[in-house]
Amino acid sequence: MIDDVDTAFENARTFIAHFAPDLVVMFAPDHYNGVYYDLMPPFCIGAAAQSVGDYGTEAGPLDVDRDAAYTVAREVLSSGVDVAFSERMHVDHGFAQALQLLVGSITAVPTVPIFINSVAEPLGPVSRVRLLGEAVGRAAANLDKRVLFVGSGGLSHDPPVPQFATAPAEVKEKLIDGRNPTEAERNAREKRVIDAGRDFAAGVATIAPLNPQWDRTLLDVLASGYLEQVDSWTNESFVEQAGHSSHEVRTWIAAYAAMSVAGKYRVTSTFYREIPEWIAGFGITTAVSIDE
């Protein structure tokens, strides 16, 4: 399985190297490492961003294109999509891991990081995510750059991420403001997730199962280009069919919606595996505009 994933990433890296982007616009979630309930926006664009370095990812500042970030933010706001804006965004493996695996490091290519809340209820309708992506796509079209859109997040999965409504008081406080954990606290948290993955693979975990059929349906919808189909998907249906963290596919929807602004596109590769050890339906796709 690891060899298959490594090959899929190598193919994606080759695709990106051939495209040679001037800018990466990345849509990604957070896992209560950078954004908390003390102020939880549905979307946030970063003009500067710092990776916290969780799960062994690279820590430190991303190479953020501030001018492009401001341009994107203005277009999104003028399109009627309310988006937060940050000059000091903190991001986790949702951003950093994808950048490292796809382009080599968090500073390899200038980036505009766009956070999409995918775990902290209440969540907005999926249609707003699509509209966000389209607005970002319109902004990118005016940048005079070769722009790579990346959506980073799991497919069906239900890892042990606490839900605010049911969490004990001490956990709620961490969800409200758990910034700057000690190394021991971060290690313990990551160990809980890794242990849950082992239990899940062994069939003894009490979390929701993966749903390959749901995952493949989503990938088919994204490949079809008819993204309005997701507008009818309720937030509850995500959780019921694919687990609480399946909302991370909002990043995929936004990335494909951004690409759709340039016209029809073609998916050039699709990789999918059901990986219980990672508590995730795992996918990698690449796509190009028909005119590319």
Model-predicted segments: where are they?
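Beta-strand elements within well-structured catalytic alpha/beta cores of enzymes
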Residues: D22-A28, I114, K145-L155
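Flexible, D/E/H-enriched segments
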Residues: M1-P21, Y37-L131, N142, P162-E292
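Short active-site-proximal "capping" loops at secondary-structure junctions
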Residues: D30-N33
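Glycine-centered flexibility sites
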Residues: G133, G151-G153, G281
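Phosphate/ribose-phosphate-bearing ligand recognition and processing surfaces
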Residues: G154-Q163
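Non-transmembrane, aqueous-exposed alpha-helical and coiled segments at domain scale
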Residues: E134-N142, V147
